[in-house]
Amino acid sequence: MSVMDALFLLATEEVGHFGINTNLLETNVINLAILIGVLVYFGRGVLGKTLGDRQKQIATAIAEAEERQKVAAARLAEAQQKLTQAKQEAQRIREDALTRAKAVKEEIIAQAKREIERLQETASQDTSAATERAIAEIRERIAAMALAEAENQLKARLSQNPDLQRTLIDRSIALLGGK
């Protein structure tokens, strides 16, 4: 006996005649049973299809979410790798800058030492040249003073002794090719 037959029998009266039951409590239970039976019988396919479609949508959404999670994880790994590379590059640049700074510092110090040595040598040469010029100037002054003193003494002797003056003039003429 099928569900429909059972429902049909419930709808009949005791006597066997088909009729309407006026008892509300019995009719509600019967109506609910009929409704549930109809829904189960006819709604099984629709409900199964709807639940199947919903299950497919959920599975698709889960698969898409997993794929997005994989893509996000790959992007995160790539970003972390780039960050690591950037940190390594920054460290390398820092080390290069320190190396260059040391080299430039050493070059500047060496250049300053060379400049100091050159200035000291130039100062030494200038001092030597100034000393030589001073010595030469002192020699010239001493020579000029000695000549002036010799002239003064010669004039004094010549003015005191006129014969000596004549003798000196005669010798000078003889030296020049005179008598």
UniProtKB/Swiss-Prot annotation:
The keyword Membrane applies. One of its GO terms (cellular component) is plasma membrane-derived thylakoid membrane. It is a single-pass membrane protein. One of its GO terms (molecular function) is proton-transporting ATP synthase activity, rotational mechanism. CDD domains: ATP-synt_Fo_b (cd06503). Its main location: membrane. It comes from the Bacteria. Keywords: ATP synthesis, CF(0), Hydrogen ion transport, Ion transport, Membrane, Thylakoid, Transmembrane, Transmembrane helix, Transport. F(1)F(0) ATP synthase produces ATP from ADP in the presence of a proton or sodium gradient. F-type ATPases consist of two structural domains, F(1) containing the extramembraneous catalytic core and F(0) containing the membrane proton channel, linked together by a central stalk and a peripheral stalk. During catalysis, ATP synthesis in the catalytic domain of F(1) is coupled via a rotary mechanism of the central stalk subunits to proton translocation. Component of the F(0) channel, it forms part of the peripheral stalk, linking F(1) to F(0). Belongs to the ATPase B chain family. HAMAP family: ATP_synth_b_bprime. F-type ATPases have 2 components, F(1) - the catalytic core - and F(0) - the membrane proton channel. F(1) has five subunits: alpha(3), beta(3), gamma(1), delta(1), epsilon(1). F(0) has four main subunits: a(1), b(1), b'(1) and c(10-14). The alpha and beta chains form an alternating ring which encloses part of the gamma chain. F(1) is attached to F(0) by a central stalk formed by the gamma and epsilon chains, while a peripheral stalk is formed by the delta, b and b' chains. NCBIfam families: ATP_synt_b (TIGR01144), PRK07352.1 (NF005606). This is ATP synthase subunit b.
